[in-house]
């Protein structure tokens, strides 16, 4: 339970029609009394003067008091809504700080107190910052879903399933004299597989949510002179890369951060992949592969004037064999202005094929729409939940321990090891919602918030 009271401006710094000062803690009611000159009625908006220590008026506006526990932080909360000039806001905060027991809030401290007082879990607290920082309607929808608890519900469902399975497994361990072999009756294996399948579905949606938040990493790869740099320029809308007819012009990695309808993408142009004798080009090609291995999606560039093939395994089997399985691939047949091919997307099973001309820009809009779809943009959906890198890491660790437990069950009927792996997996899932989190982790998360949130 906190004993100090915090204050900060809740609205963005700068000039505005309205500025809001937020106060939270046991001294909030005293602050209201000293600044407004009266005891405020709970959850009732009153238009009042805001007074300095000598009784002179600093400003006038709306005062709202929310007694605990029915407030954002779960503590007594006061909001003063005055004129939004920076001087006025600063004068009000300085006035409030003259009252004993009040100090300036740290970044994210209001949300941190809401979390510590069980007003929201950790994913919901993080969703507040994500909603504020959303760069597209789709990202805002996803952040709102997390704020409303959609992500948390999925995690809680997994945790509940793990708890029930742990009870069953540990009962089998504790009561070995029972005639029924609980570990071999099929229920444990079936329930464990159902949890793994459910976790895989959550991981897939969380990965989509992380892309929505952090942006999708798209690597343009292919042989020299396929038009990779021209495509980077076409997508970024500027001449980021040097374009010539000389194969191997690009020898290093080029990056551009762009937005498509507000959705962030990190576009990376790489050196043409081939067996190079030049030492500098070799380094560039190895860097290209480093980027490819970390990509969310690879745009496989093909010079349409050199082949009629559309299957990347036929065009370049060595490249496909070396490409990690989890990375999505889109085949780009470039130079359609010369081959006179029909432009746009052609879904020939998988991967997706797009015909375009990077030089003229024809067909590039089809690629932009395709990339939006890959990021989860639908235009009319409610949006999935938002996720962060730490969520993905925790989900992955949980999945790894479940798979270890499954191997021990299937191979050795090792109930004790399975029970321990289930416990560790549950612990990793609890880290996501904050039911098990170190103080250091909480400090890092909330320090990234705005002051006043």
Swiss-Prot record:
One of its GO terms (molecular function) is GTPase activity. Its main location: cytoplasm. Residues 215-376 form the TrmE-type G domain. InterPro entries: G_TrmE (IPR031168), GTP-bd (IPR006073), GTP-bd_TrmE_N (IPR018948), GTPase_MnmE (IPR004520), MnmE_dom2 (IPR027368), MnmE_helical (IPR025867), P-loop_NTPase (IPR027417), Small_GTP-bd (IPR005225). (6S)-5-formyl-5,6,7,8-tetrahydrofolate binds at residues 22, 79, 119, 453. Its cofactor is K(+). GO terms for cellular component: cytosol. It is found in: Cytoplasm. CDD domains: trmE (cd04164), TrmE_N (cd14858). Binds 1 potassium ion per subunit. GO terms for biological process: tRNA methylation; tRNA wobble uridine modification. Keywords: Cytoplasm, GTP-binding, Hydrolase, Magnesium, Metal-binding, Nucleotide-binding, Potassium, tRNA processing. Its EC number is 3.6.-.-. SUPFAM superfamilies: P-loop containing nucleoside triphosphate hydrolases, TrmE connector domain. GTP binds at residues 225-230, 244-250, 269-272, 334-337. Mg(2+) binds at residues 229, 250. It holds the Pfam family MnmE_helical. K(+) binds at residues 225, 244, 246, 249. Homodimer. Heterotetramer of two MnmE and two MnmG subunits. HAMAP family: GTPase_MnmE. Belongs to the TRAFAC class TrmE-Era-EngA-EngB-Septin-like GTPase superfamily. TrmE GTPase family. Exhibits a very high intrinsic GTPase hydrolysis rate. Involved in the addition of a carboxymethylaminomethyl (cmnm) group at the wobble position (U34) of certain tRNAs, forming tRNA-cmnm(5)s(2)U34. This is tRNA modification GTPase MnmE. The gene is mnmE.
